[in-house]
């Protein structure tokens, strides 16, 4: 069961006075009075918290008493063992911090900013003062700014009551000013912000995935283009080799067919040259005649032209003189055979 320590008690205090002092804060299970101090046992821990929050520093029988949560190992049924303190009484010399005394703070969205706060006013004093309006779950003083505090309530009605009732009241010689903190008043906004952040993160992730996909697609397209170019080049080379082998394997073709093939190769070669010139000139007219465009136009002209380069002409032209020599040798052999036949006759 929760116990509350009462210090600085008058020696004339009786149990009836303690019951009156704690009336309105729940059911009391037991009262243990000592010389100058005592303990009160509550049925509910919430009632004990409320009593500590509101009754600490209040007057009882002409004395400002200390009301705090009792801490320490229990010796017997009558009470707890506390270290000695100067001035008598069994209050512990190891005083607890304010946060331990008042319990863990609970953050809510019903928040008020307290301005013009006295520098002597601590967060405990501010919390005790604000409990007149309702249940206070969180309090801070001079944390972010000097002469400014923060109060958070359990419900919106408590916050509204404090705003209407305690705005302009005096604490430690200063009239405080209460302002509702609107950005923190609704968790829905924060939830929507977190949702929008998650949505933006999802969008950014999807965008990054799309960009990576488009990059991979562009890379695959460029690879397929380079492969098609290399295939075109290899095909053109193979075609050139085939044409060379055909020209070598058919030395007995007529002169007319040779002239036709020469004229065709010349025409197509001139066409490919004109195409490459027009493609290489077009970027210069647009103001972007770079070296890369020239190399591309050359590679495209090479892949577009199925026939081989001019050197094939020299190889295809080379066979005629051999045939001329063969015809000369045939005429000589014929003349020799005629002369032999005439000599025999």
UniProtKB/Swiss-Prot annotation:
- Glycyl lysine isopeptide (Lys-Gly) (interchain with G-Cter in SUMO2) crosslink, residue number(s): 182
- List GO terms (cellular component aspect): cytoplasm; nuclear speck; nucleus
* SUPFAM superfamilies to which the protein is assigned, alphabetical: RNA-binding domain, RBD
| Gene3D superfamilies assigned | 3.30.70.330
Which chain positions lie within coiled-coil regions?
none
**What keyword terms does UniProt attach to this protein?**
Acetylation, Isopeptide bond, mRNA processing, mRNA splicing, Nucleus, Phosphoprotein, Repeat, Repressor, RNA-binding, Ubl conjugation
* Location in or out of the cell: Nucleus; Nucleus speckle
User: Annotated Gene Ontology MF terms?
Assistant: mRNA binding; pre-mRNA binding; RNA binding
Give residues where Phosphoserine occurs.
45, 81, 84, 299, 301, 305, 316, 318
Q: Where is the composition biased (Basic residues)?
A: 185-250, 323-345
Q: What is an annotated GO biological process for this record, any one? A: negative regulation of mRNA splicing, via spliceosome
The segments labelled Disordered in the record are 75-102, 176-345
Instruction: List N6-acetyllysine occurrences by residue.
Output: 165
Post-translational modification here is noted as:
Extensively phosphorylated on serine residues in the RS domain. Phosphorylated by DYRK1A, probably in the RS domain. Phosphorylation by DYRK1A modulates alternative splice site selection and inhibits the expression of MAPT/Tau exon 10.
| Biased composition, class Basic and acidic residues, residue ranges | 264-273, 282-293
Q: Which PROSITE patterns match?
A: RRM (PS50102)
Residues forming the RRM domain are 1-72, 110-183
Q: Main role?
A: Plays a role in constitutive splicing and modulates the selection of alternative splice sites. Plays a role in the alternative splicing of MAPT/Tau exon 10. Binds to alternative exons of TNC pre-mRNA and promotes the expression of alternatively spliced TNC. Plays a role in wound healing and in the regulation of keratinocyte differentiation and proliferation via its role in alternative splicing.
Q: What is the annotated quaternary arrangement, including any partners?
A: Binds SREK1/SFRS12. Interacts with DYRK1A.
User: Record's PANTHER family?
Assistant: RNA RECOGNITION MOTIF RRM DOMAIN CONTAINING PROTEIN, SERINE_ARGININE-RICH SPLICING FACTOR 6
- Which family does this protein fall into? Belongs to the splicing factor SR family.
The molecule here is called Serine/arginine-rich splicing factor 6
Species: Bos taurus
Give the gene name.
Answer: SRSF6
């Amino acid at each position: 069961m929760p116990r509350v320590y009462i210090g600085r008690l008058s020696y004339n205090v009786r149990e009836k006075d303690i019951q009156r002092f704690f009336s309105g804060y729940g059911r009391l299970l037991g009262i243990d009075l000592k010389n100058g101090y005592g303990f009160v046992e509550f049925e509910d821990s919430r009632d004990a918290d409320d009593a500590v929050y509101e009754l600490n520093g209040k007057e009882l029988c002409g004395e400002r008493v200390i009301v705090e949560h009792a801490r320490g190992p229990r010796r017997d049924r009558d009470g707890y063992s506390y270290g000695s303190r100067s001035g008598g009484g069994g209050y512990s010399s190891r005083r607890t911090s304010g946060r331990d005394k008042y319990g863990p703070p609970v953050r809510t969205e019903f928040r008020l900013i307290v301005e013009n706060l006295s520098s002597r006013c601590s967060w405990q004093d501010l919390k005790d003062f604000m409990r007149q309006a309702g249940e206070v779950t969180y309090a801070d003083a001079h944390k972010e700014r000097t002469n400014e505090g923060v109060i958070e309530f359990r419900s919106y009605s408590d916050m509204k009551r404090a705003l209407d009732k305690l705005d302009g009241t005096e604490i430690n010689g200063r009239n405080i000013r209460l302002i509702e903190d609107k950005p923190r008043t609704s968790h829905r906004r924060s939830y929507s912000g977190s949702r929008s952040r998650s949505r933006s993160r999802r969008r950014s992730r999807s965008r990054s995935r799309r960009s990576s996909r488009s990059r991979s697609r562009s890379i695959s397209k460029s690879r397929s283009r380079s492969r098609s170019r290399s295939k075109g080049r290899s095909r053109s080379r193979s075609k050139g080799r085939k044409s060379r082998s055909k020209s070598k394997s058919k030395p007995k073709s007529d002169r007319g067919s040779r002239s036709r093939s020469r004229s065709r190769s010349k025409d197509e070669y001139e066409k490919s040259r004109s195409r490459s010139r027009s493609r290489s000139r077009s970027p210069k007219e647009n103001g972007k005649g770079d070296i890369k465009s020239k190399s591309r136009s050359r590679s495209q002209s090479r892949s577009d032209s199925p026939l081989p380069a001019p050197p094939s002409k020299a190889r295809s032209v080379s066979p005629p003189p051999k045939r001329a020599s063969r015809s000369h040798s045939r005429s000589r052999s014929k003349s020799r055979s005629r002369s032999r036949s005439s000599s025999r006759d």
